[in-house]
C-alpha cells in the first residue's frame, strides 16, 4: 500500500524525474518566471525552496550541496549571488504559483511559477 508516501511520480523513472526538476529549478532561477503544469509547479516548489534557504548562508559546503542537486554552475551562481541575499530576511515562501487556465492540447491545468520580489522588466506597449 502507498500510505505516507509523499511526492508525485509523473509516470517517470526516478532519474528522469530528478533531471526534470533540476532543469526546471535552474530555469526558474535564471528567468524568475516559468510556465508549467500545475502538479509539476507544486512539486517544483518542494525542490526549489529548500535550495533558496540553503543559499542564505554562503559557504563552500552549501555551494557543493546545491551543485549536487542542480548540476548547473550558472544556476548555483545565481542562487548564491542573487537569491540568497534577496531572501535573507524572509523565513520561507519564496515562490508564488499563479493558475493560468488549461492547455489547449490535453486540457491540463497550467500555472506560472514566479519568484517573489523579482525585478520587473517594463515592456513597451505599442
From Swiss-Prot:
Q: One Pfam family this chain carries?
A: Ribosomal_L17
Key words, A-Z: Ribonucleoprotein, Ribosomal protein
GO annotation (BP), single = translation
> Which Gene Ontology cellular-component terms appear in the entry?
cytosolic large ribosomal subunit
What InterPro entries does this protein map onto? Ribosomal_bL17, Ribosomal_bL17_CS, Ribosomal_bL17_sf
The record's GO molecular-function terms, alphabetically, read: structural constituent of ribosome
Quaternary context: Part of the 50S ribosomal subunit. Contacts protein L32.
User: Record's family?
Assistant: Belongs to the bacterial ribosomal protein bL17 family.
Name of the protein described by the UniProt record: Large ribosomal subunit protein bL17
Task: Tell me what organism the protein belongs to.
Answer: Xylella fastidiosa (strain M12)
Amino acid at each position: 500500500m502507498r500510505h505516507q508516501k509523499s511526492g508525485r511520480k509523473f509516470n517517470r523513472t526516478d532519474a528522469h524525474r530528478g533531471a526534470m526538476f533540476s532543469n526546471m529549478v535552474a530555469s526558474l532561477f535564471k528567468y524568475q518566471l516559468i510556465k508549467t503544469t500545475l502538479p509539476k509547479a507544486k512539486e517544483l516548489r518542494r525542490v526549489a525552496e529548500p535550495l533558496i534557504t540553503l543559499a542564505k548562508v554562503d559557504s563552500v559546503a552549501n555551494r557543493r550541496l546545491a551543485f549536487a542537486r542542480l548540476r548547473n554552475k550558472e544556476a548555483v551562481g545565481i542562487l548564491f549571488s542573487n537569491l540568497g541575499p534577496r531572501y535573507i530576511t524572509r523565513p520561507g515562501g519564496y515562490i508564488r504559483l499563479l493558475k493560468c487556465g488549461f492547455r489547449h492540447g490535453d486540457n491540463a491545468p497550467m500555472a506560472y511559477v514566479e519568484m517573489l520580489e523579482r525585478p520587473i522588466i517594463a515592456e513597451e506597449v505599442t
